[in-house]
Amino acid sequence: MNYPPMGLTHDDPGKFVLGTVPVEPDGSAHFRVPAGVTFFVQALDEQGIAVQTMRSATYVQPGQTMTCIGCHEPRNTAPPARPPLAVMRAASPIELGPAGSWPLHFDALVGPVLEQHCVRCHQPDADASQLVFTPERAYDILVDYGQPSLRTHVLDRYRQGRSAAGAGAAQTNPLAILLRQGHHGVQLDADAWSRLYTWMDTYGQRRGSFSEQQDEQLRQLRDELAAMLAAQTNASDGADECTMMPVTAYETRRRGE
């Protein structure tokens, strides 16, 4: 486990991002996922920041339809006397995550953001030379930046074994807060924010797989499933449907593990 180094807990099984799907105003979602691929779910706000993370994983078999209703409602109330909005329409296509999230690699996911917005000032001969972003040092600098650092946040959540609503990594990370408030005129576009938030909310992984061979297998899986993930089609071999009723009506990020 954790060799080569995967993440901050030294107990990471590896993960990658399947993508995002929309959520209806009543909190329901309807989408298709690849069969036999273990996954879990994050609820996202309108900025793409995780507000809570599912702390268990699941998977489905070819042709299976799964409904996640029962665990997210108060015990003393009856289910709504109306069908969820999401089941009244076709399954949503999954929008793939940013480059570098499948397979998941820090250098490919966050590296382009650093190159475009950070290294000009954060290099040995520049004004902000106290933090030098080189390929060898960038990861450790970012996971240890501020208090509580991303490393501290991840390890605390790992020990607690649960995800606290409203206290996600990208919500509370000092670097993310600094950039949102403004930092020497740095202006991140939507892709850059998506890359940073995805990396933080997947708990600061250095990488999501154990070998180059596994990376290649993940790329092949992504290419094979691209049509199913990106297009609204009827259920077919190798795919299944999920209907979910999350607590909060945000987007839902599908994370493959």
Feature map (PLM): residue ranges:
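Extended low-complexity, serine/threonine- and proline-enriched intrinsically disordered segments
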Residues: 1-10
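Short, acidic Ser/Thr/Gly-rich low-complexity loop/linker segments typical of extracellular
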Residues: 9-26
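Aromatic- and Gly/Pro-enriched helix-to-coil junctions and flexible linker segments
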Residues: 13, 36-38, 42-57, 62-257
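Short, surface-exposed beta-strand/beta-hairpin micro-motifs centered on an aromatic residue
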Residues: 26-32
